[in-house]
């Protein structure tokens, strides 16, 4: 099954393999994903599952959200996410169904999507890995500047998309082909080898790897 689930980044730790090798892992909590809507080709033009997970205080839920959750007959969650379905996939899943971490029991590798940590306004060296200029040898002002950003009279402008200083991080990032180290269905935990995008407690989308 190639359906993705929504999880929460708990943090990183390490576990030891049988041969004593230390494996760095990220712990992802995947509580029950409750299906709030099933989108079909006939009504929506594409096939997808809309899911929610976790909980949300009643006074933080808008009336449209409350009506949507009530119509689906599920408890209000901390957000709504959509997972696309391939042809012939998930046809037996109905509104109100619950999807759990055990669907990854037979999956070897996953892709994890999240929002990267925000770094604020950064220069070209940190943001784009530009090379710094000389600290001495006559350079007294331009140690960490971007350098030339264009040509001369032709074209007489800076091209769109030029890598320059600006806001870094806080964008959607996907890390591909992470090994699944352990699936703990009792505690709703998924352990994957290596790091995943985002800060602790950030929301993640976990899907079977497309390039595995």
From Swiss-Prot:
InterPro entries: Ribosomal_uL3, Ribosomal_uL3_bac/org-type, Ribosomal_uL3_CS, Transl_B-barrel_sf
Keyword Repressor tagged: no
GO cellular component, one term: cytosolic large ribosomal subunit
Residues that bear N5-methylglutamine: 153
Gene Ontology MF terms in the entry: rRNA binding; structural constituent of ribosome
Subunit structure: Part of the 50S ribosomal subunit. Forms a cluster with proteins L14 and L19.
Protein name: Large ribosomal subunit protein uL3
């Amino acid at each position: 099954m190639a359906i993705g689930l929504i999880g929460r980044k708990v943090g990183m730790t390490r576990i030891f393999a049988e041969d004593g090798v230390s494996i760095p892992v990220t712990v992802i909590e995947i509580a029950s994903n409750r299906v709030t809507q099933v989108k079909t080709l006939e009504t929506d033009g594409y096939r997808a599952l809309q899911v929610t997970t976790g909980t949300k205080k009643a006074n933080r839920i808008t009336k449209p959200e409350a009506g949507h959750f009530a119509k689906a007959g599920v408890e209000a969650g901390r957000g709504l996410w959509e997972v696309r379905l391939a042809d012939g996939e998930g046809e037996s899943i109905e509104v109100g169904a619950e999807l759990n971490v055990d669907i990854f029991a037979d999956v070897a590798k996953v892709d994890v999507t999240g929002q990267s940590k925000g770094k604020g306004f950064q220069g070209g060296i940190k943001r784009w890995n530009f090379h710094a200029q000389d600290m001495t040898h006559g350079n007294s002002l331009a140690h960490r500047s971007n350098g030339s950003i264009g040509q001369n009279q032709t074209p007489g402008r800076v091209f769109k998309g030029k890598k320059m200083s600006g806001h870094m991080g806080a964008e959607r990032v996907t890390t591909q082909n992470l090994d699944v180290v352990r699936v703990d269905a009792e505690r709703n935990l998924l352990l994957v080898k290596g790091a995943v995008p985002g800060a602790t407690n950030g929301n993640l989308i976990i899907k079977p790897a497309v390039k595995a």
